[in-house]
């Protein structure tokens, strides 16, 4: 039973199974990075299983193409599509690799997200400083989860974000764990549970 989805220029949007024939509006989790269609379907299926097991709220999952303007995509998606509760308390972000730069630009723009997960982030010292400044400027701080492979050559960057968040006394999670069979989404459920606890339905 495949999840209903909508393809736009820069994103693929999957609705919860409960959304069919419903007028209810749902929170939305944006995921940006190199994720093929097969991976998306696996992640959506895992997410729906978590919903069925009452581990998480039903939500819209929006997979945004890598290296596209995230702020613009969010604006387009939430204007064009129905069934989305577009507010900071209902919006979260998972960003992979060098897409953290698009993430930072979106975070800087306005109070967009209630929670942010950065996975194997690629960036420099400026990016780290910009991320901290951006989340610090929020009226309501979006909690951050930083996930990095222990052997990653970008370990220093994620570690730097962790240190800066700690120095700013901003509550966050920092994880450095090996992935199973090179699957970057090994800890997908952990990230969803973390964001679920931030979303206020």
Label the predicted regions:
Residues 85-97:
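Alpha/beta-hydrolase fold nucleophile elbow
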Residues 115-200:
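The feature captures the conserved acid-bearing segment of alpha/beta-hydrolase catalytic domains
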Residues 25-84:
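Active-site machinery of serine-nucleophile hydrolases
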Residues 95-100, 120:
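Catalytic nucleophile serine of serine hydrolases
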Residues 17-23, 50-54, 81-87, 133-140, ...:
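Surface-exposed acidic, glycine-flexible loop patches that form ligand/cofactor-binding
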Residues 1-27, 59:
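A domain-start/cap signature at the N-terminus of enzymes
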Residues 88, 113-114:
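Core-facing hydrophobic residues within beta-strands of well-ordered domains
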Residues 100-110:
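Short glycine-enriched nucleophile-adjacent loop
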């Amino acid at each position: 039973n495949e999840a209903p989805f909508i393809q736009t220029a820069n994103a693929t949007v999957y609705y919860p199974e409960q959304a069919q024939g419903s007028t209810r509006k749902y929170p939305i989790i944006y995921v940006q990075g190199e994720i093929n269609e097969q991976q998306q379907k696996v992640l959506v299926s895992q997410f729906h299983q978590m919903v069925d097991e009452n581990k998480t709220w039903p939500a819209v999952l929006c997979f945004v193409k890598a290296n596209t303007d995230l702020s613009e995509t969010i604006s387009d998606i939430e204007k064009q599509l129905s069934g989305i509760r577009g507010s900071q308390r209902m919006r979260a972000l998972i960003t992979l690799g060098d897409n953290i730069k698009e993430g930072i630009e979106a975070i800087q723009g306005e109070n967009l997200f209630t929670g942010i997960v950065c996975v194997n982030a690629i960036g420099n010292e400026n990016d780290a400083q910009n991320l901290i400044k951006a989340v610090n400027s929020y009226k309501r701080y979006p909690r951050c989860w930083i996930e990095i492979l222990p052997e990653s050559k970008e370990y220093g960057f994620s570690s730097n974000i962790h240190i800066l968040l700690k120095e700013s006394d901003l509550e966050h999670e920092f994880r450095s764990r090996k992935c199973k069979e090179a699957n970057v989404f090994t800890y997908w459920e952990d990230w969803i549970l973390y964001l679920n606890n931030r979303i206020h339905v």
